[in-house]
Amino acid sequence: MERYSVLKDKNPREIVLLRGSGCKWKRCTFCDYHLDYCLDEEDNYNLNAQVLSKVTGIYNKLEVINSGSFCDLDNKTMDLIIKTCEEKNISTVHFECHYIHHKEVPALKEKFKEHNINVRIKTGVETFDVDYRENVMKKGFGKSTPEKIRTYADEVC
């Protein structure tokens, strides 16, 4: 599985697919994302360190995706992301976050801000048709409105 790439066209950035402890929601009907996980933090860190070693900083932006939300990555990996950003002059990092973790976003942004790194949070809303999103896709946002979602998410997909 390829875990590093460079996106050159729309919103140029480097992107890494890291491995974490797995999505805690695991109910989205269309998703097999949660299958790429490992409960061994040291194994995850070793794999993630190999992937992050490929980052060059070419666009000063890094997108970090994983088998869940940013909070499913171990602390050593999170520290290595910060170190990589500092060493490669990356000023903006994009992370994914499921709605169930939205209260953890401010602490993440503050931690990275201490290192002069801007954090952008992306969440997979998929649709604002609440009935379809919750009863068919099983996304777990409840009746959250776009206004509520934008209080923690900078980007939606």
Provide a role label for each language-model segment:
Residues Q50, K76-K83, A107-K111, S144-T151:
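Alpha-helical scaffolding segments of alpha/beta enzyme cores, especially the outer helices
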Residues C28, L108, E134-N135:
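Short aromatic-enriched loop/helix-cap "lid" or pocket-rim segments at secondary-structure transitions
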Residues Y33-N48, K54-D74, C85-K103, I117-P146:
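Core AdoMet radical
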Residues Y4-N46:
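Canonical Radical SAM [4Fe-4S] cluster-binding loop centered on the CxxxCxxC motif
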Residues E87-K88, K148-C157:
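A structural motif corresponding to the C-terminal end of an alpha-helix
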Residues F112-N116:
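C-terminal intrinsically disordered extensions
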Residues V16-L17, C23, L52, C85, ...:
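Generic hydrophobic, helix-prone segments enriched in Leu/Val/Ile
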